[in-house]
């Protein structure tokens, strides 16, 4: 069985408050799953490069073994356009696509939200999320804007967004989510709470900027790309824990050209 899920960008990072917000974007991960007697085998390719970390695949299989009470093996293939360790929800997209493909292969009658929650559980077990990333998972699976209580696994707000152009800046370094375990985010909580309030009111542009500047400063990411984007009238934010920065702009080509001095640049759109 085949399934797909998309990347997303952050409106509010949940590290400080447990409440997160994200919007889907048009970069995709596709998974193919076949059942077999036992064991797990397959391959993962991200933007043409082979990845050998199968932790998430094993965790998804374990979640569904427990859900069904059955023992089974899987043969899988994952192809992804989403850069990893950049804050662009590559893990959420993979968990969603794998969970949907495996649920279909097993013939399970699951709602879409049940599939999403199974993927979140697998991501927690695999250690690729600190908060559960329920917001990222919803934005990845469904598209649109989502605000969620990640600790309580509750949807607080959801609304459609226009398919506006998005520019992604991918600096040379990467940052694994698990490397931030134990980091104290309480000093920035009051500022992130303001971003949450704005996101709940649908003011995602303002929320993304506040969140991005606060987390970028706290985590030591450069903010010069923010200044350049703001000068061009773009909506700009930090995606996840970074280092990826995104901008929603009506001048994607011009901003992309200016951002190339900081790293690799991709263009896509909201979904």
From Swiss-Prot:
It catalyses: shikimate + ATP = 3-phosphoshikimate + ADP + H(+). GO terms for biological process: amino acid biosynthetic process; aromatic amino acid family biosynthetic process; chorismate biosynthetic process. ATP binds at residues 83-93. The keyword Protein biosynthesis does not apply. It is an enzyme of class 2 (transferase). Pathway: Metabolic intermediate biosynthesis; chorismate biosynthesis; chorismate from D-erythrose 4-phosphate and phosphoenolpyruvate: step 5/7. Keywords: Amino-acid biosynthesis, Aromatic amino acid biosynthesis, ATP-binding, Cytoplasm, Kinase, Nucleotide-binding, Transferase. Its main location: cytoplasm. Its EC number is 2.7.1.71. GO terms for cellular component: cytoplasm. It comes from the Archaea. The keyword Nucleotidyltransferase does not apply. It is found in: Cytoplasm. GO terms for molecular function: ATP binding; shikimate kinase activity. Belongs to the GHMP kinase family. Archaeal shikimate kinase subfamily. This is Shikimate kinase. It comes from Thermococcus kodakarensis (strain ATCC BAA-918 / JCM 12380 / KOD1) (Pyrococcus kodakaraensis (strain KOD1)).
């Amino acid at each position: 069985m085949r399934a797909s899920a998309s990347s997303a960008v952050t409106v509010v990072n949940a590290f400080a408050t447990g409440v997160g917000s994200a919007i889907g974007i048009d970069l995709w991960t596709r998974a193919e799953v076949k059942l077999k007697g036992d064991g797990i085998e397959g391959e993962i390719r991200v933007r043409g490069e082979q990845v050998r970390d199968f932790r998430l695949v094993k965790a998804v299989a374990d979640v569904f073994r427990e859900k069904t009470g059955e023992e089974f093996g899987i043969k899988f293939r994952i192809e992804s356009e989403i850069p990893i360790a950049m804050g662009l929800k590559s893990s959420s997209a993979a968990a969603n696509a794998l969970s949907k493909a495996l649920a279909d292969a097993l013939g399970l009658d699951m709602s879409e939200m049940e599939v999403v929650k199974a993927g979140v559980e697998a991501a927690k077990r695999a250690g690729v999320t600190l908060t559960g990333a329920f917001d990222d998972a919803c934005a990845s699976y469904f598209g649109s804007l989502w605000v969620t209580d990640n600790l309580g696994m509750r949807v607080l707000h959801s609304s459609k967004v226009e398919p506006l152009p998005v520019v992604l800046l991918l600096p040379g370094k990467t940052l694994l989510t698990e490397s931030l375990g134990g980091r104290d985010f309480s000093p920035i909580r009051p500022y992130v709470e303001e971003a949450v309030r704005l996101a709940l009111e649908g003011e995602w542009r303002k929320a993304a900027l506040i969140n991005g500047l606060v987390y970028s400063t706290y985590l030591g990411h450069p903010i010069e790309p923010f200044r350049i984007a703001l000068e061009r009238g773009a909506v700009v934010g930090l995606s996840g824990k970074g280092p990826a920065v995104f901008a929603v702009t009506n001048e994607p080509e011009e901003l992309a050209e200016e951002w190339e001095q900081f790293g690799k640049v991709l263009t896509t759109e909201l979904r």
